[in-house]
């Protein structure tokens, strides 16, 4: 699909803007969600947000400490993986992060979900093409249900 340059904002700038504005999510949730995948549980990104805790600072601190503990566990869990396995794990996370599109849409001021999907797909494919070998890209993009069991060598 060809898009007019004036109709879209350069997606690399958008991704960089999103990453900059979402550091409080990324620092804690990237590894927490990798751990969640390994453990078969889900970490709700909204719980990390300052505006999502009804009981104020105490809940935020408890959630932060929980995630910090999970980060320690994920560090140990991925330590023995080789580089190829880590690549699969990262692309698996990319696929799962797409579920958090409302966060990215808000940061990027995208009003149309279709624009978001096009932007995301372009960014994911370009990211994969630039940083990962073709076999991994094909396996990840053709199977969005890829899970960490593949990383662990169990098919």
Regions inferred by a protein language model and the residue ranges of each:
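N-terminal interaction/assembly modules
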Residues: 1-80, 109, 132-155
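Short, locally clustered residues in the helix-turn-helix/winged-helix DNA-binding domain
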Residues: 79, 93-94
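A short pre-motif secondary-structure segment
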Residues: 88-89
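A general structural motif at alpha-helix termini
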Residues: 92-93, 108, 120
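A short structural micro-motif
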Residues: 95-96, 126
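Helix-turn-helix DNA-binding module
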Residues: 96-115
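DNA major-groove recognition helices of helix-turn-helix
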Residues: 116-134
């Amino acid at each position: 699909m060809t898009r007019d340059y004036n109709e879209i904002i350069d997606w690399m700038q958008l991704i960089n803007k999103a990453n900059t504005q979402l550091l409080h999510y990324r620092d804690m949730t990237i590894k927490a969600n990798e751990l969640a995948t390994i453990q078969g549980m889900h970490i709700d990104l909204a719980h990390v947000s300052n505006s999502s805790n009804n009981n104020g600072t105490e809940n935020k601190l408890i959630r932060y400490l929980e995630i910090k503990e999970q980060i320690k566990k994920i560090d140990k869990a991925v330590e023995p993986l080789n580089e190829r396995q880590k690549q699969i794990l990262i692309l698996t996370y990319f696929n799962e992060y797409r579920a958090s599109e409302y966060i990215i849409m808000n940061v990027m001021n995208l009003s149309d979900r279709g624009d978001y999907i096009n932007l995301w797909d372009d960014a994911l494919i370009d990211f994969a093409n630039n940083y990962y070998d073709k076999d991994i890209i094909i396996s990840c993009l053709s199977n969005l249900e890829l899970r960490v069991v593949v990383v662990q060598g169990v098919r």
